[in-house]
């Protein structure tokens, strides 16, 4: 009789551990998918940032407000 109870306890413990492992595997898969999504978003934002940086540079170079003037050479 004690053997049956011990076997039942072991079986319940194994079942609990298997369920815990499966839950952790699912969590890991979810986290891995999230990391991949964040990496993709990061690459997209880097690309957009480069485009915006180039756009700002072009605007600044086309605007007289941002042109550097050497006032000392004009005075001479």
From Swiss-Prot:
Q: Which domain of life is it from?
A: Eukaryota
**Pfam families xrefs:** DUF2205
| GO biological process terms, semicolon-separated | positive regulation of macroautophagy; regulation of protein complex stability
Keywords of the record, alphabetical order, are: Coiled coil, Cytoplasm, Golgi apparatus, Membrane
Coiled-coil ranges (or none): 6-52
Residues in the signal sequence: none
Membrane topology per the entry is: Peripheral membrane protein
Can the keyword Zinc-finger be found in this entry's annotation? no
Q: What Gene3D superfamilies does this protein's entry cite?
A: 1.20.5.170
What are the annotated GO cellular component locations? cytosol; Golgi membrane
Where it sits in the cell: the answer is: Golgi apparatus membrane; Golgi apparatus, trans-Golgi network; Cytoplasm, Cytosol
Q: Which family does it belong to?
A: Belongs to the SCOC family.
Q: What is the official name of this protein in its record?
A: Short coiled-coil protein B
Q: What species is this protein from?
A: Danio rerio
Q: What is the lineage of its organism?
A: Eukaryota, Metazoa, Chordata, Craniata, Vertebrata
Its gene is: scocb
């Amino acid at each position: 009789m004690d053997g049956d109870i011990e076997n039942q306890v072991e079986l319940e413990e194994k079942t609990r551990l298997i369920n815990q492992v499966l839950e952790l595997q699912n969590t890991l898969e979810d986290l891995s998918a999230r990391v991949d999504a964040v990496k993709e978003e990061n690459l997209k934002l880097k690309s957009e940032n480069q485009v915006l940086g180039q756009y700002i540079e072009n605007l600044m170079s086309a605007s007289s407000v941002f042109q550097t003037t050497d006032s000392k050479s004009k005075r001479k």
